[in-house]
Amino acid sequence: MSTKMLSLLLAAAFSFTRADASLSYSSAEEIVKYCTPRDAGTPRGEIAANRILDMVSSTGADARKDSFFARTPLGRRRFNNVYAEFEANPTSSWVVVVSHFDTKSGIVCPGANDGASTTGLLIGLANALVDRPIKNINVMLIWTDGEESLYSYGENDGLQGSIRAVSNIEALKRNVKAVICVDMLGDKDLNAIIPANGTKELTEKVLSVAASLGLSSIVSKSNVHVKDDHQPFLDRGFPAVNIIDFSYGPKNSWWHTSSDTMDKISEESLFKAGSLVAGVISSLAID
């Protein structure tokens, strides 16, 4: 399909509006203001999950919280994921969009970009899906706890929320067409990459949609591998892709620091990121 033809089809399909971007930004702001810190598998993390549940529900979406225990290097901890499902047709396949909300433990980190930005983005997407339901494909949004590792990624350290989500989706026997993991996409100087550890066809899909939306200058394919919430899906055979901006501040110096604050992210970047994700969902519905 040509870029021009895809552009025309996407223009008539599911869209992400400026109002959705505004909600995304204000939601991120609320998370940072009231839920910092929100370290993985902690009572503060559960406070954040409850607030996310309330914010998603306020869009009119049918949201639920899944609380579970998982092992960590510091023993068993209680984690909390939040889900919202938008079923267009029981026989249609599913697109899963996932973002973590937790912050890195052991440091003072507001996590405005790393966690809150795409948490807000998914709330904006929930609002869009309630307001403008998409046809021909079902969408599941997942806000995960436990993406961040306590020490370093390894067995029982990090990705607990996405590992749990994979198990739930397998138990439901959902026909998943694509998993899109979004992370750190609020950066005012947005430069998103698609890491090498992703499904090739989905990577090309994201690049094609970015081109059709005039976003090629801020979305590119990378040779690096990134450990993120898409990895457990890949490990279980689901087609998955990660969209992440891993150049946050000079030499990524704002990442996992007290400098990860709201003044570093923008509504405009969330609008571009939301438009890209909505475009990919629409393109998958057209296929």
Positions of the model-derived regions?
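A non-catalytic alpha/beta surface segment that caps or lines the substrate-entry region
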Residues: 29-87
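Sec-dependent N-terminal signal peptides
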Residues: 5-14
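N-terminal capping segment at the start of a domain
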Residues: 16, 20-47, 59, 102-103, ...
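Acidic/histidine-rich catalytic neighborhood of metal-dependent amide-processing enzymes
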Residues: 78, 105-209, 213-217, 222-225, ...
